[in-house]
Structures are given as C-alpha cells and as structure tokens.
Amino acid sequence: PYRKDNLVLAIDKYINSFLNDKTKNKYKAVNSLLKNELPDIKNLEKGKNLIDEKKDFNEECIKVVKNLNSSLLVIQGAPGTGKTWISAKIIIELLKQNKKIGVSSLSHKAINNLLLQIEEISLKEKFKFKGIKINSAESEGRDNFEGKTSGTEKELIINTTGHSMPEDCSLVAATAYAFAYRPPLPKVKGEKSKKGPPVFDQNLDYIFIDEAGQVNLASTIAIGLATKNLVLIGDQMQLAQPIKGTHAGNAGKSGLEFLLKNQDTIPYNRGIFLKETRRLDKKICDFISESFYESRLKPHEITKKRKVNLNLKNF
C-alpha cells in the first residue's frame, strides 16, 4: 500500500508555513507552482521567451536552469526528444557547480533510468560525484539502482534505505515519500538519540521530477518543500498518473497538468519545449505535431536516413 503519512505531514507543514510566514519567502518554488507564476530567471525579464532560438539549444537549456532563482520550471518533450539526456546533462553541469541535486519520480524504475543517463555522462566526461539512491527497506533490493559503477570501488551512486546520508553527498534520488518532510525524531531524556531518515527541508538546490505527468499535485508539493528550485520533466500527452479515487477541483491533476491548464504545449515564456524528435519520420511527425503539439514538434535530421522495410512484395 502507498504510505501517506509523510505526505500529509508535508502538506500540513506547507499550509502552516504559508499562513504564518507573512513574507512568503519560504518554499518559493511551491508558491510559484500553486500560483502558476512565470519562472523567475536571473538576468531575464519575466514574460520574455526563455530560450534564444538563435543560439545553441542545449546550451540555452542549461543556462536557463542554472539561472533559476528559487522558482519552478517545466521541460516538456514528446517521445524521442531527449528529455532524459538533457535532464542528465543539466544535472551534471549543476553538480560541477557544487549544487545539491535531487531526482524523483512516481516509480523507482523512472528514477533509475535517469540515474543511468547521469552516470553515463559523468563517466564520459570523467566527472566524479557522490550520490545516494533511497530505497524502501520492504523492496528488499528490487528498487536498487544498478549502474556500470555499482558495486565497484568507483561507485558513484550508493543504494541506501534512507537512514543515513553522507555529508559530502551531492545527489539524492528518491520517491515523494522519502523527500516528504518529516519532523526530526524527538530526543528522549536518558536514552541515546535515534538517527532517523534525513529531513529534507529546502536543503537541496534543485529537484528534478521525471515523468512529472504521473506525479500528483500533492506529491509534487511535498517534494518541492525539500528544494529551492523545482524542475518538472515530462509530457502530459504520454502516460497520465494512476488514479485510485475522485478528487475535487484541481487536486486530482498532476503538477504538470496543473501548470499547463489544458494547453498542448508549454508557452515559450513559461518553460522549455524540446522541439526535435529523433524517433519520428517527417510524415508521421508532421501529423503528430499538428494534432497534439501545436505544430511545434519537428523531426531531427537523423530521421531522414531511416527507412521501414515492411517486405510487402506479395501484397
């Protein structure tokens, strides 16, 4: 069963903070989410397009995220647009700046998939960092991250059940339950203090939520309390979140759906739309783009070289 206690504590903490903090300076990323505000980017006037189309697209993406100023950003991409790769590349660049990074998603499978790409880029660039993957003890290792360096002396990402966190750790990967705020364990007089799970309360610089279209709004808020900046990665046109009940108003939406408000693509001044797919042939891409992505999705040059041989000579 899905454990809700930490998520309830997190939402309760946010509500109390919002009501009692007159400055509203804490949890700015979550505030931006619920108010559906424009991203706050350093050195960029609010309302301006986030990406300069005349410059290198990947470099522009990295620059925008680096300059995120206690705010929220959406990276939307159709299948084959490189959501995982660009997210991992951005994360590596942030780690190089000594930023504390979080990685989350609805499932451990999605988290591990992004971690594999992060590990691959770090090895290619010969960049070392220390990361942990927090798993449930009940999973008995089934959710563990298994990468190229796992179990070796050069291990980059260590699996843990969440009851210890190295001080020099720069990347933490976990589901909403682990990131959700929980009060520190109380000290009992005469007893040895217990070391509980790490308390994440804005001690991370960034959290990247992959497949954000599957993470409900409440969980997105709970995760957001752990960080100064929140990046939602996904595509509402792909798999939606699993729904087990009926929720009033916007409560049943994912964080991504809540921000897009029935728009097919994220506006130029609100987020980053990954415009090139390496998966779809031009004719197929044109149809998909016009039907679902406001004609913004284009086929990459590499797709021109692909052919599908159906071997239909006898038909």
Region locations from a protein language model:
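ASCE P-loop NTPase motor cores of helicases and related translocases
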Residues: 1-178, 296-315
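Conserved helicase motor core of SF1/SF2 NTP-dependent helicases
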Residues: 96-98, 107-112, 117, 177-180, ...
